[in-house]
Curated annotation (Swiss-Prot):
Disulfide bonds join C123-C428, C130-C205. CDD domains: serpinG1_C1-INH. Changing P489R: In HAE1; phenotype consistent with hereditary angioedema type 2. Changing R466L: In HAE1; phenotype consistent with hereditary angioedema type 2. Residues 85-119 are annotated as: 7 X 4 AA tandem repeats of [QE]-P-T-[TQ]. Glycans are attached at residues 25, 47-48, 64, 69, 71, 81, 83, 88, 92, 96, 238, 253, 272, 352. This is Plasma protease C1 inhibitor. Residues 1-22 form the signal peptide. Changing A458T: In HAE1; phenotype consistent with hereditary angioedema type 2. The lineage of its organism: Eukaryota, Metazoa, Chordata, Craniata, Vertebrata. Changing P498S: In HAE1; phenotype consistent with hereditary angioedema type 2. It comes from Homo sapiens. Interacts with MASP1. Residues 20-43, 65-118 are annotated as: Disordered. Sequence repeats lie at residues 85-88, 89-92, 93-96, 97-100, 101-104, 105-108, 116-119.
Amino acid sequence: MASRLTLLTLLLLLLAGDRASSNPNATSSSSQDPESLQDRGEGKVATTVISKMLFVEPILEVSSLPTTNSTTNSATKITANTTDEPTTQPTTEPTTQPTIQPTQPTTQLPTDSPTQPTTGSFCPGPVTLCSDLESHSTEAVLGDALVDFSLKLYHAFSAMKKVETNMAFSPFSIASLLTQVLLGAGENTKTNLESILSYPKDFTCVHQALKGFTTKGVTSVSQIFHSPDLAIRDTFVNASRTLYSSSPRVLSNNSDANLELINTWVAKNTNNKISRLLDSLPSDTRLVLLNAIYLSAKWKTTFDPKKTRMEPFHFKNSVIKVPMMNSKKYPVAHFIDQTLKAKVGQLQLSHNLSLVILVPQNLKHRLEDMEQALSPSVFKAIMEKLEMSKFQPTLLTLPRIKVTTSQDMLSIMEKLEFFDFSYDLNLCGLTEDPDLQVSAMQHQTVLELTETGVEAAAASAISVARTLLVFEVQQPFLFVLWDQQHKFPVFMGRVYDPRA
C-alpha cells in the first residue's frame, strides 16, 4: 500500500526587487543555465512517506561565512561596487597570491580565499568546510537548537490558527530553508536569524551538520531558480552546490514556462504528493530557492486494518465517530506527565523515527492548557524520560488521520519578532542587488496516518491480562515525528478533528 505515515511540507519564500545589480555579469557564475546540473533528490522522493518542501526566493551573497548556518540581516548594503572594477585592485592587497584573479575562488569553497571588499560591514564570503569530527560534534548542539526552534514555531503557529483547529508543520523544513538563507545573510539579518533559529553566534559547521541529519528515512534536496538579469555571487553558488547539492537554474522570461518548471520540480521531489505548488508566479520574481524534504516512515509494527472500526472521539463539546486503529498488544512507551497533566506515548517507526503523542490526561483537561505549559525545558524532559522508557505491550486506540495545513510564514516570522524578514532583509552574500524584498513565504504540510507497517504483526496468540497497559487517544492531541538518532522534531502539530 502507498501511505503509512505520510507528511508533506512546503515552504515558499519569494523575493522580488526593482532591478538586478547594475552589472549583472559581476561575480555571477549562475548566468549559464545549468540544466545539466540535476538536483540529487529526484531519485529519493519515492522512497519516503513524509515530504517537506521549502520555496525561497532570496538573493544571498556569501562572503565570509564558514560552514556556519548562522546568518542574520545587517544593514550593510553591498551595492554593485565589484562590477565597475572587478579585478583591477589585486596588487594593492598583500594576499598570498599576488597576481591571481580573485574573482573565481568558486568550486572548492576555499578556506583562505580573499573576499570582495565590503565597505566595512559584515557580509558573508567563501565557506570553509569543517572536518567530519567537527561536523559530528556540532550535531548535538544543532539538535538542541532545533528543539528550541520547534517549540517557538509551535506556539507561533498555534497563535495564528483558529481555536480548536488542526495544524501540522515541519520545523526541520523551515530551519533548513532559513539556514541556507544564512549563507548569504549580512549583519543584522545574520544575527536575527541565529536568534530565531536558537543557534549560537557564528555557529560554524551548521550547514554540514544539517546535511548529516538527512538519513535513510529523511531525504533533503534543494534547487535554486533565478531570473536572467539577477547576478548571483559565485561564493553563494559554490556553497549551495557543496552544502545543499544544488546548482542554480536560470528562469526564462516566460512566466507560464517558469511556473511549469517549478511545479514540475515540486511534483518530482514530493512523489507527486504536491502536484501543483503555485497557481501563478509574480512577474517581479527574481529568485526562487527550494528545499524539499521527503521523509518515509512506516510503523515498526503493523496495525491490522480489520480491527479498525468507527469509535467515539471527543471534539469540542460533542462526540464524533472516526476510524480508530486498534491493537491489544501494541508496543508503546508511555507515562503520565504531571507538569502537562498529559498522557505521553511513543510508537516506533522505521528508520530510527518515532511518533510521540501527547494527549490530555482526561476530558477535564484541555489541549490548550497543555500547549501553554509546553516549554522547551518541559519538552526535553519528556523526551529524555521516553528515551529511558521501555516499549511494552499496550492496548492501543489511535485515530486514522489526515491533516493538511497551509500557513503564511511572513505572519509567523513577525510573531517571532523577526520583522526585517519583510522589511529590511540583508542578503548581500547572495547578490549585489540591494532592492530585493520578500514578497511571499508559504508553508504547506500534509499528514496522513494509516495502518500499514514495515513488519507484520506476530501471529502467535497471547492472552490479554487484566493488568494490560492502556493508551487511548480519543480526544484532541499533540503529535511529534521524532528523529531518535539526532534527537529533534521533523514534524509537529495537533489534531482536533481526525476527519479533517
